[in-house]
């Protein structure tokens, strides 16, 4: 997988940048509780969803109450009763309490696809605040590609990219894939081994 992503997408990625989990729900449980919740120093960190609505399945992935905060989107009205929602960067608040930013691409259940430009802006903001940008790519690019608008795959050491084999037609496999920097992969591997 690392070789394919390096060859096809030009990502600087090695096997040490990949962890497998018992499904993508397990992956998000690990990530949400690694970057959010009560810290050793007593501070509480939260998962920021820059768009709402977002996947309802995340609600059960935390060990604590009030783990999540979301932002109201800008809604673009399109012809024939259609709409698209976008990140409202003007009102997006990233503070000391933000432990990570998380977005699904495409968003479940609406199928909204965050644009490449929005994704790059979120990545820049996450970098600026020293927090990871987690992308739930269960339906997106580079695979399984169940996406109906233009979207360029994005990964760098500050991005945690999550994928799922079940969306490739292998639901019985219960295999989630996490692509991240080695420090995060080491933490996930340790959590996965318990």
Predicted regions and their residues:
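Active-site PLP attachment segment
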Residues: 150-188
